[in-house]
């Protein structure tokens, strides 16, 4: 069983707030990939509303979720191009490749590789939702824990992949939803959150 993690709940509440804006529209019978499915359980309530969704989750840790779950490394998955209409990453991309979780191999550019995979796995017209740590003051890696992104780091990763920002929302460290109002820069080793809606 995965230990209780209030950080996962906080990021799930950000997803719920963005979903409530009406910006995240799941097409009928959408094929959905969740990257890092062991903690933030949005699948159960979503499938109660939308039983037509076909959700596949991938995580290093064992996860019992509705839909299909794959225990393993997202970077070794060989999904065909265009396999998914929607990709969801709730507080996951920033951890990939840092070796934080048991048996999680180190890939220095794990987040970059994963974002490139997401761009390939998305079907034309598909969208991806990512919520990640954010600090306008600068990009930073917190040991093996997580990456904190700024606007430059995001642009460097997303622009070459042909992923376009279709929406951006913020939440502060406590999870208070700020909508489209960017938070003030924070000191080093501190962050808020940004949620991105990306399209191809």
Predicted regions and their residues:
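A conserved beta-strand element that flanks and buttresses the S-adenosyl-L-methionine
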Residues: 88-93, 97
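Class I S-adenosyl-L-methionine
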Residues: 150-200
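A short glycine-rich, Lys/Arg-flanked "PGG" loop and its adjoining helix->strand segment in the class I
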Residues: 106-127
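Conserved N-terminal segment of class I S-adenosyl-L-methionine
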Residues: 1-82, 90, 116
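Short, flexible/disordered intra-domain loops and linkers
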Residues: 98-111, 139-147
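Short conserved AdoMet
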Residues: 27, 123, 159
């Amino acid at each position: 069983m995965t230990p209780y993690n209030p950080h996962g709940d906080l990021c799930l509440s950000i997803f719920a707030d963005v979903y409530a804006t009406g910006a995240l529209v799941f097409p009928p019978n959408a094929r959905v990939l969740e990257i890092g499915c062991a903690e933030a359980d949005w699948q159960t309530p979503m499938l109660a509303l939308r039983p037509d969704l076909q959700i596949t989750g991938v995580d290093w840790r064992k996860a019992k979720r509705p839909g299909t779950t794959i225990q393993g490394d997202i970077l070794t998955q060989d999904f065909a191009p265009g396999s998914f209409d929607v990709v969801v990453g709730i507080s996951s991309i920033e951890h990939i490749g840092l070796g934080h979780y048991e048996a999680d191999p180190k890939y220095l550019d794990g987040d970059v590789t994963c974002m490139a995979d997401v761009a390939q796995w998305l079907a034309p017209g598909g969208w991806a939702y990512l919520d990640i740590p954010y600090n306008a003051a600068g990009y930073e890696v917190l040991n093996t824990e997580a990456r904190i992104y700024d606007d430059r780091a995001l642009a460097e990763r997303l622009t070459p992949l042909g992923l376009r920002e279709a929406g951006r929302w913020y939440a502060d460290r406590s999870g208070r939803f700020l909508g489209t109002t960017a938070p003030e820069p924070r000191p080093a080793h501190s962050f808020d959150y940004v949620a991105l809606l990306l399209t191809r």
